[in-house]
UniProtKB/Swiss-Prot annotation:
SMART domains: IG, IGv. One of its GO terms (cellular component) is extracellular region. One of its GO terms (molecular function) is antigen binding. This chain was isolated from a myeloma protein that binds phosphorylcholine. PROSITE patterns: IG_LIKE. CDD domains: IgV_H. GO terms for biological process: immunoglobulin mediated immune response. InterPro entries: Ig-like_dom, Ig-like_dom_sf, Ig-like_fold, Ig_sub, Ig_V-set, IgHV. This is Ig heavy chain V region HPCM6. The keyword RNA-binding does not apply. Pfam families: V-set (PF07686).
Length: 123
């Protein structure tokens, strides 16, 4: 069974940092692109970061809203995806999800999602 389990959310003051984790199991972690997506209260889902697969050297990509503040990385030995979040702002308050990318030519799908972890940025 393929599973994604996020953790690490919580309450943090503006300007603070958090590191989210996404523990994965049931598939070959290195073969897949992995994504971070968030949903602020009352708003739509927003893609924020990607970690490409081993074949693409685990290169990364970020949305403009988090670039320079957030860093996505992997522990390939433990099959964990991370999101280091720095210089947090009130507008970063959201439920954060990790998702697996699946390629079925000619389309990409986020085919497996975790349950999410909540981040609240407030003083």
């Amino acid at each position: 069974e393929v599973k994604l389990v996020e953790s690490g959310g919580g309450l943090v003051q503006p300007g603070g940092s958090l590191r989210l984790s996404c523990a994965t199991s049931g598939f070959t972690f290195s073969d897949f692109y992995m994504e971070w997506v968030r949903q602020p209260p009352g708003k739509r889902l927003e893609w924020i970061a990607a970690s490409r697969n081993k074949a693409n050297d685990y290169t990364t990509e970020y949305s403009a809203s988090v670039k320079g503040r957030f860093i996505v990385s992997r522990d390939t030995s433990q099959s964990i995806l991370y999101l280091q979040m720095n210089a947090l702002r009130a507008e970063d308050t959201a439920i954060y999800y990790c998702a697996r990318d699946y390629y079925d030519y000619p389309h990409w799908y986020f085919d497996v999602w975790g349950a999410g972890t909540t981040v609240t940025v407030s003083s």
